[in-house]
């Protein structure tokens, strides 16, 4: 009898236990598992995509293109404000908040991947994955500090554990970048030697080709060594060594080619133009092209829509109209359709969809590496024509995606012989400026500031709004993101009223922070 008394109680206990287990299962978000159980190889895909889409070719690139006069800002909104150098846009903390947050989110992802590759981690011993993450981390930290100077780094990315991370000096961040790259080179060398393939097709850049990642690590190191020319007498020679190492290892560019052309997966620059119509050609670029009879002019200076194209032989021919930097009448137009656009940003004949929505994104191009070599060779008094031809040829191959080019790179460089003879460094920098007009404007912005720090000016910026009386309105750096300014007192104090962007260069380019 006692036995039967316990059976209902046991059944109730079992039901309660099952119900509790079931509720635990129901309350678990199986569609979004916690980050600690996700394999790092799956996370690297997002890190690659966001590095290209957000950090290398997002807000930083868009605004830098206007400051560099590679794009004319129109549309009577944000880009108009940037074109006219309005303080609220150029120095405002809201301007770069999205890309500031997006880059830190990418770095948090990469931090987790690197941790998973450590001893006892989910991806322990996977040197290929670790090396990839370290290269991408170096790139993201590099762009973030190049744009903003001193930033939260060593204490950042800790969530609620540390809500007020300190600002690290740019000097210390650069040391960290080089440490990341040295470790990446060692890890990728080991991965290559051992034939590791832990990432597979989750690697959207190279399909887990460790040799290509190793070459990319050297290319990234060459870029950041070049940035150090103002601060380190050995930086130029080291940049040349790393650039040559990248080429010798088979570097062919860090190029993101993932877009299907739909509205949900369109190349970032094309998506930006499609949503805003802010981007037109500039007379600054046009003049440089015309002065050199540059064969890229028909691609760089085009119509808003392919349907607007006219034959120059047509008696009613109207040439594309470029924006004049700082021209308020042009800047306040309701959209770029009243002006010209580079062909890669043009619309189809119907004028209702981008003509090239699948255009690739350069995280770091092959032409950039050859330009680094050409610049250092020119500065050393060596013959730079071979490297310069290779740099321009790499750019021509990219631009041919959008239109025909009537000359070969070697023929074009031959036509520049007198310019190269007169001032080889200047011509290299002009050619680099022109070659980076499509989606590499962040590095152009760095070049202009780097040369300025060295007492050089090879690109003549013509926007009269760069000065307001005796006060500069051309930004020597970009303002911090609003999330940092509003939530971190250290960032808020560094930001102040934002006007420091007009007077204080970042440390690598001669400033103090």
Describe each PLM feature range.
Residues 412-418:
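Extracytoplasmic gating/loop element in the C-terminal half of outer-membrane beta-barrel translocons
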């Amino acid at each position: 009898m006692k036995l039967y008394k316990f059976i209902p109680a046991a059944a109730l206990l079992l039901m309660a236990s099952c119900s509790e287990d079931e509720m635990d299962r129901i309350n678990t978000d199986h569609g979004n598992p916690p980050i600690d159980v996700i394999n790092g190889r799956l996370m690297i895909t997002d890190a690659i995509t966001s590095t290209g889409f957000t950090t290398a070719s997002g807000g930083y690139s868009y605004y830098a293109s206007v400051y560099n006069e590679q794009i004319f800002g129109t549309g009577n909104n944000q880009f108009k404000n940037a074109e006219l150098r309005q303080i609220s846009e150029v120095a405002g903390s809201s301007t770069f908040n999205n890309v500031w947050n997006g880059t830190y989110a990418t770095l948090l992802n990469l931090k987790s991947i690197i941790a998973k590759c450590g001893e006892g981690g989910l991806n322990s011993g996977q040197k290929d994955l670790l090396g990839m993450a370290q290269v991408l981390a170096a790139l993201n930290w590099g762009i973030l500090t190049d744009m903003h100077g001193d930033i939260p780094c060593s204490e950042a990315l800790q969530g609620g554990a540390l809500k007020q991370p300190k600002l690290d000096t740019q000097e210390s961040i650069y040391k960290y970048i080089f440490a990341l790259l040295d470790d990446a080179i060692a890890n990728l060398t080991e991965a290559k030697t051992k034939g590791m393939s832990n990432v597979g097709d989750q690697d959207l850049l190279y399909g887990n080709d460790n040799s290509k990642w190793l070459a990319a690590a050297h290319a990234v190191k060459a870029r950041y060594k070049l940035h150090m020319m103002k601060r380190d007498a050995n930086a130029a020679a080291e940049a040349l060594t790393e650039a040559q190492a990248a080429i010798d290892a088979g570097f062919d560019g860090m190029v993101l080619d993932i877009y299907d052309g739909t509205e949900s997966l369109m190349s970032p620059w094309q998506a930006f133009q499609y949503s805003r119509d802010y981007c037109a050609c500039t007379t600054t670029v046009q003049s440089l092209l015309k002065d050199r009879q540059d064969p890229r002019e028909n691609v760089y200076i085009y119509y808003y829509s392919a349907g607007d194209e006219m034959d120059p032989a047509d008696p009613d021919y109207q040439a594309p109209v470029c924006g004049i930097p700082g021209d308020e009448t042009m800047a306040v137009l309701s959209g770029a359709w009243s002006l010209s656009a580079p062909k890669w940003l043009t619309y189809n004949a119907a004028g209702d969809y981008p003509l090239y929505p699948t255009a690739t994104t350069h995280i770091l191009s092959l032409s950039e590496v050859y330009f680094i070599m050409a610049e250092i060779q020119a500065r050393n008094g060596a013959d730079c024509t071979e490297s310069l031809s290779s740099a321009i040829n790499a750019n021509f191959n990219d631009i041919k995606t959008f239109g025909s080019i009537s000359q070969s790179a070697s023929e074009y460089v031959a036509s520049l012989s007198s310019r190269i003879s007169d001032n080889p460094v200047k011509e290299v920098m002009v050619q680099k400026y022109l070659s980076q007009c499509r989606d590499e404007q962040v590095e152009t912005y760095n070049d202009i500031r780097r040369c300025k720090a060295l007492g050089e000016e090879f690109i003549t910026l013509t926007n009269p709004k760069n000065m307001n009386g005796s006060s500069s309105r051309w930004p020597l750096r970009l303002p911090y993101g609003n999330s940092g300014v509003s939530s971190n007192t250290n960032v808020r104090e560094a930001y102040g009223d934002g006007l420091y962007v007009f007077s204080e260069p970042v440390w690598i380019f001669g400033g103090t922070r």
